Amino acid sequence: LAAALARRLAQLADDPEGTLFFGRIDLDGTGHEPAEVFHIGRRHVSDPEGDPLVVDWRAPVSTPFYRATRTEPMGVAVRRRYGFQRGALTGFEDESLTAPGPGAESSAILEAEIERPRTGPMRDIVATIQPEQDVIVRSGIDRTVVVQGAPGTGKTAVGLHRAAYLLYSHRERVSRAGMTVVGPNASFLRYIRDVLPALGEVDATQTTVEQIVPAHGRQRGPDPAGPGREAGVDRYYGGRVEATGFRVAD
């Protein structure tokens, strides 16, 4: 019990730049039934009676926030995005998914968040995940996923959010096997180290290839198989990438 409480406290550690929620979806009410409203945030928050005040972004009910469109509203009538600056609410935008006529071309709040200068350690992108990225993040645990893209297209961020999703949706299975994030070097790990904790996940270990492969087990020099091995690897993983059908948009 003590270990569980300590873990929960670590998950709820306050982030001065963080916010309790960043979005809301109003479901399309039917008949005389009132429409359900869900606030979407980084972590689940309940009232004393156990009713949800904020729904975790990884919960199934949150999926329409990222994927609903005018043509496929997924039962959502209105999607709301909140704007924050240093933890203070600065505004919000409502997007109707059921009103006639063309929808809004873009969200000023969404664009401002995406274009916010990236300084210091990597931040999570949970408020700005795009539909094609969400498909990757929520893909099944039994599927191998390879994310390709040019520099700056969000490959690392999508991979970390997928890790957070798997820890949430398959916690028991992942906890038994453990989860490790392997980076190219220590500087890279320092750059990404705050992303998973910001999403409430503190159990994943982070390491480098050099830390998990003993020095005496590494050999330097040309590959005796030469270009043939590289071509074979490219064909194998190229096929796996095509099989997944996932890409991060440029």
What kind of feature is each model-predicted range?
Residues 152:
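Walker A (P-loop) phosphate-binding loop of P-loop NTPases
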Residues 147-149:
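Hydrophobic anchor at the beta1->P-loop junction of P-loop NTPases
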Residues 155-156:
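Conserved lysine of the Walker
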